[in-house]
Amino acid sequence: MKPDFEKGDGLLTTVVTDADTKDVLMVAWMNAESYQRTLASGQTWFWSRSRQELWHKGATSGNLQDVVSMTLDCDQDTLLVAVHPHGPACHTGHTSCFFNPVELEQGA
């Protein structure tokens, strides 16, 4: 099965998890080139929407992500990537980019 890059204007939403803990580490985007580089290198590559450039995760910080598995969703437009991280996924130094709780309104 191949990803469908047409649905998301050339980008796949990519959910990255820790292969051992199953924790969600981050959400990023892949285009066709970053997808191919990820397959070829065994490490995560993404497309930076803000910088409009390819991004080898951890190349600067040393917090690389070794790919263990990649799974497409049923619509082939979202990718789940399980990794062995070499450090925190978040640029803030947190293990995961998801560390800001949202308070729910009571009775909502």
Swiss-Prot record:
Zn(2+) binds at C74, C90, C97. It catalyses: 1-(5-phospho-beta-D-ribosyl)-5'-AMP + H2O = 1-(5-phospho-beta-D-ribosyl)-5-[(5-phospho-beta-D-ribosylamino)methylideneamino]imidazole-4-carboxamide. GO terms for biological process: L-histidine biosynthetic process. InterPro entries: PRA-CH, PRib_AMP_CycHydrolase_dom, PRib_AMP_CycHydrolase_sf. It is found in: Cytoplasm. Its main location: cytoplasm. Its EC number is 3.5.4.19. Gene3D superfamilies: Phosphoribosyl-AMP cyclohydrolase. Pfam families: PRA-CH. One of its GO terms (cellular component) is cytoplasm. Pathway: Amino-acid biosynthesis; L-histidine biosynthesis; L-histidine from 5-phospho-alpha-D-ribose 1-diphosphate: step 3/9. Binds 1 Mg(2+) ion per subunit. GO terms for molecular function: magnesium ion binding; phosphoribosyl-AMP cyclohydrolase activity; zinc ion binding. Mg(2+) binds at D73, D75, D77. Coiled coil: none annotated. Disulfide bonds: none annotated. Keywords: Amino-acid biosynthesis, Cytoplasm, Histidine biosynthesis, Hydrolase, Magnesium, Metal-binding, Zinc. Belongs to the PRA-CH family. NCBIfam families: PRK00051.1. Homodimer. This is Phosphoribosyl-AMP cyclohydrolase. The gene is hisI.
